[in-house]
Amino acid sequence: MAQAIFEALEGMDNQTVLAVQSLLDGQGAVPDPTGQSVNAPPAIQPLDDEDVFLCGKCKKQFNSLPAFMTHKREQCQGNAPALATVSLATNSIYPPSAAPTAVQQAPTPANRQISTYITVPPSPLIQTLVQGNILVSDDVLMSAMSAFTSLDQPMPQGPPPVQSSLNMHSVPSYLTQPPPPPPPPPPLPPPPPPQPPPPPPQSLGPPGRPNPGGNGVVEVYSAAAPLAGSGTVEIQALGMQPYPPLEVPNQCVEPPVYPTPTVYSPGKQGFKPKGPNPAAPMTSATGGTVATFDSPATLKTRRAKGARGLPEAAGKPKAQKLKCSYCDKSFTKNFDLQQHIRSHTGEKPFQCIACGRAFAQKSNVKKHMQTHKVWPPGHSGGTVSRNSVTVQVMALNPSRQEDEESTGLGQPLPGAPQPQALSTAGEEEGDKPESKQVVLIDSSYLCQFCPSKFSTYFQLKSHMTQHKNEQVYKCVVKSCAQTFPKLDTFLEHIKSHQEELSYRCHLCGKDFPSLYDLGVHQYSHSLLPQHSPKKDNAVYKCVKCVNKYSTPEALEHHLQTATHNFPCPHCQKVFPCERYLRRHLPTHGSGGRFKCQVCKKFFRREHYLKLHAHIHSGEKPYKCSVCESAFNRKDKLKRHMLIHEPFKKYKCPFSTHTGCSKEFNRPDKLKAHILSHSGMKLHKCALCSKSFSRRAHLAEHQRAHTGNYKFRCAGCAKGFSRHKYLKDHRCRLGPQKDKDLQTRRPPQRRAAPRSCGSGGRKVLTPLPDPLGLEELKDTGAGLVPEAVPGKPPFAEPDAVLSIVVGGAVGAETELVVPGHAEGLGSNLALAELQAGAEGPCAMLAVPVYIQASE
């Protein structure tokens, strides 16, 4: 196969001959009709800037093929230190051709121009791969000679050639005007019949670089020498003649053997071993080694990574790495470096003209300008539907449905209807209602710029991004409320207010009269950014609607645009913000879609219905970890846990005015207590003239009229409206209390002191035995007054009158009222009576029945 090359160039040494023979036999790049070969897919690789021809002995590399062949003729020295390269430029492309000969010659261009060589610095390509992407030097030499011998051959006209799998360095060239063609060479013998050609090769080129003319690169092929055609080749600047055969000493220098394949890394100027040898050589059926090549995608990625690391070979200066003086980061552009340095210094050279806020990047100023845009004044209202409350008539008799629809009662209410609109239709006409009215609540969110409606606020907020162009720039001056749709007119208007404007630092809050003074001040925060004042998390609240804002400017804009007037369309209530109105609207509706099957209540969400179901089941899954209380709802447990806190956070706000020192653990208790200071008692009892400030207190009072108490004493059957009152109740009639009374009796009888005569001598007279339980009941029963006609008799005593007998002159009676820990009207405690009394004393419990006067 290589005989044609050996006959054309007889001056090659044995090393070159062995390399060429092993290449042609092993890689199977050229079809051999006499031997078996393995067809490897053509490797597509990006092209470097120039072709490189490497000498096998002295390792010199050349960019020009004639200069390389001249070097081979002059018997190069292996120890030459200098490496010279010559550049080869082309101005056309190779036409495709193919032939089934032993050696396939590369197609030649119609016109070729070779420039003079230049000297470049030594290239890192002094070593080549054994089985990698870059071939050994002798392989490059073989391909170069094959291309050189094909320069004098005519241009064929035939099918596309088979691209050699040899990975040669090619140079892209731009098409220029071709010179006039030279005279045709002598005819050559015709080639043998061609074989079916494989698919044509794809265009080669570096990633991202266009190839003019489709294939404007110098490509080296192994093609047949004798080809028919009329193409001519003209070589300028170098007169090239056939070289005579050279005698080379029969010495073969074995190339170095690498244990593992190496990959050339252009960026690091060196070689590095591969990993687990991904490109291991394959063994053919004949026992030869077939070189394997990386996939085109792998080659393209590798070339792209190392394209910037070949400054010597490409002839371009290497980009200088700009290193940050504060850290170890490097940048290729000065612009990126300067922006990075600002992160260390805190410098912010770009200021907003409207508010003076400084930024490190100009793009951030443009983003910040969007914060000065507001919605137009006419579209800053609420998102509540105008017909949020509607009344729909539902017919109980389907035959009368058409008549009810004709009345128009199902239409939305035009104004603010009265609460009477909820009354069932047909009740006034007869006892049986034939239709009923259902109040429907529209809780959707309405867009102010289009008729779209959304079920949640987040959907509306996402939709409003489509109307961003509706926003306008508003003047920052308080007295000027002008708006501008364009930024240019807004900035021109701001300049007219420069004498009136004051600028506030967003870091420390200081005000400055001019934009320049603010900019100078902001550099003080940039000197030591790590010690700059921390941005306070101050929250600015609106006193009317309790909305929170992060800046005073935002709060001021809210006060200027918000109406704080949101009336309910169904009643006369007015709310300061929209969310309060939305929370109030469901109170007019049917309650929701989810109905409880036990109590027939409606709920807006299924989750609320599930929580409500615990009330009917009696299940209390939420238990207190401190006490034994259990609750059927989690919020009730959370509210209950407040009573276990050691400090009461909610204090009466009128303590400085009225001296009220009451404190509470729960906010709802404080709210109820505040109403007691107003003096307004709107809840009146229908059975008596009492009135209460809370509805719950009225309900407790009404149980006293009906006798339906929640809590009753087991001993005396007295009823209480609260558990606290039952706990404080001192029952004298219960069996346990009677046992305690018997155990506390004195062991001996004592006589009551009695003064006799004027001497004041005390005489002890025996007291009767303490009244037993049955006697006390009989005594109490005898004191029950007669029932007044027309009024129910008293069922139980309202109080117990404790009478202290003997011992103390100043002792008075004590009236014990249920619910009060201390007695009423007693100026001495029982312990003081027992300690200060000279004689014995006894306590008599007398039931007292109190009847209110007419």
Curated annotation (Swiss-Prot):
Entry keyword set: Disease variant, DNA-binding, Metal-binding, Nucleus, Repeat, Transcription, Transcription regulation, Zinc, Zinc-finger
GO BP terms in the entry: regulation of DNA-templated transcription
Compositional bias of kind Pro residues: 177-210
Entry GO MF terms: DNA binding; DNA-binding transcription activator activity; DNA-binding transcription factor activity, RNA polymerase II-specific; RNA polymerase II cis-regulatory region sequence-specific DNA binding; zinc ion binding
Family: Belongs to the krueppel C2H2-type zinc-finger protein family.
Disease affiliated with this protein: Hyper-IgE syndrome 3, autosomal recessive, with recurrent infections: An immunologic disorder characterized by skin bacterial infections in particular with Staphylococcus aureus, susceptibility to fungal infections such as chronic mucocutaneous candidiasis, atopic dermatitis, recurrent respiratory infections, bronchiectasis, and increased serum IgE and IgG. Immunologic work-up shows impaired differentiation of CD4+ T cells into T-helper 17 cells, decreased memory B cells, and often decreased NK cells.
Quaternary structure annotation from Swiss-Prot or TrEMBL: Binds DNA and to the STAT3 promoter.
Name of protein: Zinc finger protein 341
Source lineage: Eukaryota, Metazoa, Chordata, Craniata, Vertebrata
